[in-house]
């Protein structure tokens, strides 16, 4: 038995300079686990509740001392003496202790920090890397990254409505080669933007945030940069979008303020289909708003046979929300963010449910990140085959790529880069 003897939380800073919670778990054999919790900028209405202090005198109300106190008090007292390898029991006890549907009493950030730290401590106690401890002998798929190289929407201060323009190195034969390809395109894009007179400041996730007029202009710069780096758009490197459309869905219309367009669900679906017809776009995240179920079903009927349609705000990593989508025929993929649901067990349940019904899963970071690289291990543990963890700059993003490179080295010849194999794109 790997008995939990201490749980300690502290308030640290994330990549945006906002407070977040970090948790250390210690076991009776001396094993330890540490986890830091991320936070999003564009958040779904159905996400688990992130506990913030609301004290305007500290961090403009964004402090997390209440969550820290919950961990160091109630949660520590409840879990002391438990076997850390009983992950589902640990998570269930915390959910029951909280007693609310969305983890709003203790805070999903408090619960998640403990959940992940317990898993890490148990992995160390078992003398296994986290991906192997969670995924077993079959954990060996290195995910194809979605690399966010142009930022818009809530992730940047520019007029571009679509939140993320990403590249996917689909022809790479390894994660290390995929990272190299992405980095080369990233640097080519920087020069291309600079030569065109645009600034090369970066947004929350490390992508560039130039003052562009439209999605077409953003994609045009990326296509040029792929070619400038020596690659073939669509063959070596495909494109992916995160529309984050809930952010601009107002009164039943999709308000593309940057492009001066006000579109119905059907019109916005056609707008996206037009982009897919002209560019090698394999995946679109949040192509419709979180409550526009009819729009989602129509978009899936329109594009679902040839484009991966990823539900983020739609599903919020929640198996119950995903079950509704499965029944309705909405989307064909789920974005997986551990802090949307608040425990490791529920996260794994969402991935399992998706795979069971032929949906893909994309492991994802948040815009407010830390140096914690847990999601890299989770991507390999679940064999989901795709990861979304930002651009090729900022240490909070690079930490995940570097961890994947280490895992690939550990796996050796049994490791396999996913490439196109795990993408629902016809």
Swiss-Prot record:
Pathway: Carbohydrate degradation; glycolysis; pyruvate from D-glyceraldehyde 3-phosphate: step 4/5
Sites where the protein binds (2R)-2-phosphoglycerate: 163, 337, 366-367, 388
Record-listed E.C. numbers: 4.2.1.11
UniProt cofactor note: Binds a second Mg(2+) ion via substrate during catalysis.
Organism: Hyphomonas neptunium (strain ATCC 15444)
Domain of life: Bacteria
Catalytic class of the enzyme: lyase
GO molecular function: magnesium ion binding; phosphopyruvate hydratase activity
Cellular component, GO annotation: cell surface; extracellular region; phosphopyruvate hydratase complex
Entry-linked PANTHER family: ENOLASE
GO biological process per UniProt: glycolytic process
Stored SMART domains: Enolase_C, Enolase_N
Subcellular compartments: Cytoplasm; Secreted; Cell surface
UniProt main location, coarse: cytoplasm
Ranges for region Disordered: 32-53
InterPro entries, sorted: Enolase, Enolase-like_C_sf, Enolase-like_N, Enolase_C, Enolase_CS, Enolase_N
Listed name of the protein: Enolase
Residues the record marks as active site: 205 (proton donor), 337 (proton acceptor)
Keywords in alphabetical order: Cytoplasm, Glycolysis, Lyase, Magnesium, Metal-binding, Secreted
Pfam families membership: Enolase_C, Enolase_N
Reaction catalysis annotation: (2R)-2-phosphoglycerate = phosphoenolpyruvate + H2O
Positions with a binding annotation for Mg(2+): 242, 285, 312
Cited function: Catalyzes the reversible conversion of 2-phosphoglycerate (2-PG) into phosphoenolpyruvate (PEP). It is essential for the degradation of carbohydrates via glycolysis.
Cofactor dependence: Mg(2+)
Cross-referenced SUPFAM superfamilies: Enolase C-terminal domain-like, Enolase N-terminal domain-like
């Amino acid at each position: 038995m790997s008995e939990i003897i201490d749980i300690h939380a502290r308030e640290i800073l994330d990549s945006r300079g906002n407070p977040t919670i970090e948790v250390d778990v210690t076991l009776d054999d001396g094993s330890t686990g540490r986890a830091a919790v991320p936070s999003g900028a564009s958040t779904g209405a159905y996400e688990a509740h992130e506990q913030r202090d609301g004290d305007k005198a500290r961090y403009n109300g964004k402090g997390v001392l209440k969550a820290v106190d919950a961990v160091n008090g109630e949660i520590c007292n409840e879990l002391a003496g438990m076997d850390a390898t009983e992950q589902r029991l640990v998570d269930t006890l915390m959910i029951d202790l909280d007693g609310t549907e969305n983890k709003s009493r203790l805070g999903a950030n408090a619960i998640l920090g403990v959940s992940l730290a317990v898993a890490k401590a148990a992995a160390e106690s078992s003398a296994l890397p986290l991906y192997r401890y969670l995924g077993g002998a079959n954990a060996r798929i290195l995910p194809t990254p979605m690399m966010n190289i142009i930022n818009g929407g809530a992730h940047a201060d520019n007029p571009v409505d679509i939140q993320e323009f990403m590249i996917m190195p689909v022809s790479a034969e390894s994660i290390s080669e995929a990272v190299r390809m992405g980095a080369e395109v990233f640097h080519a894009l920087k020069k291309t933007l600079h030569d065109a007179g645009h600034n090369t400041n970066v947004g929350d996730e490390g992508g560039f945030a130039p003052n562009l007029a439209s999605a077409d202009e953003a994609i045009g710069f990326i296509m040029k940069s792929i070619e400038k780096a020596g690659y073939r758009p669509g063959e070596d490197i495909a494109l992916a979008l995160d529309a984050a459309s809930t952010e601009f869905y107002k009164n039943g219309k999709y308000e593309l303020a940057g492009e001066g367009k006000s579109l119905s669900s059907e019109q916005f679906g056609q707008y996206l289909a037009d982009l897919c017809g002209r560019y090698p776009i394999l995946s679109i995240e949040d192509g419709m708003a979180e409550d526009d179920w009819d729009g989602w079903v129509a978009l899936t009927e329109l594009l679902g046979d040839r484009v991966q349609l990823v539900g983020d705000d739609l599903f919020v990593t929640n198996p119950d929300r995903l079950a509704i989508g499965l029944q309705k025929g909405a989307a064909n993929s789920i974005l997986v963010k551990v802090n949307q649901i608040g425990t490791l067990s529920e996260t794994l349940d969402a991935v399992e449910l998706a795979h069971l019904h032929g949906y893909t899963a994309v492991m994802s970071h948040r815009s407010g990140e830390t140096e914690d690289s847990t999601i890299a291990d989770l991507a390999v543990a679940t064999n989901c085959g795709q990861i979304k963890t930002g651009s090729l700059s900022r240490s909070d993003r690079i930490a995940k790529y570097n961890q994947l490179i280490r895992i690939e080295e550990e796996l050796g010849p049994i490791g396999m880069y996913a490439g196109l194999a795990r993408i629902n794109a016809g």
